[in-house]
Amino acid sequence: LLVGTQIPPVTGTSHDGTLTMTARRQHNVSHYSLETFVATTGSALNWICEKLHWFDNPAQISALAATVNSARGVTFLPALTGLRVPQLQPNARASLCGISIATTQAEIAYAILEGIAHSVALCIDANQAIADVEASELVVGGGLSGSDTLLQIQADLSGMPVRRMHESDRASLRGIAFLAGSSGLLWDSLQQARATTVTDAVFEPSADSGARAKRRASWHARVEAELAHASAFDNGCGD
């Protein structure tokens, strides 16, 4: 989350795993940002496919998830290397809960994508709270942004439009080119460089605020349960 040329109120690493960073520096002016991230998103899908062999590939997860409207109570916490938000807890672990004999493969696929989307929504919440701003849309790039199913779930859980840019898998390369070329080499400003981007698709929220709040509350409860479990082991209860 870019926050301008003033140093954000929280510097270094905050209590919730949010980082205050210098995003870029041009013309001797620093531009700051707040950053949170989910350590295992695409890598979680690869782990599920390559190590557990539950699905052939990540594309199959997305395709199966698109065939159902919900996970029917199944939740996936993608904390394969711990949690950063809402609390920095490296000892937290991934979990797949709420499974019954009636659970289908498609519902597990949906839960996996929903777990990633919930985690990203937590990051958005943390950034907005610290910066004291309200984001109007989420612009996405990278490999996972190729999943329409994931981006629709993300829009529903974050309550804001999700905009996928053209050639989103080249987002990092495009950002480097914008920074390198926006000092007069190719463009006069970063804003001028950004104006050249082309939108591939926009995913609008389809869930109402009540349904969104219920889903988010259920997810927060699952995260808090895992944090309590990790804390108990930290205190020696698991010995």
Which positions does each model-derived feature cover?
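Active-site core segments that coordinate phosphate-bearing ligands/cofactors
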Residues: 1-141, 146-239
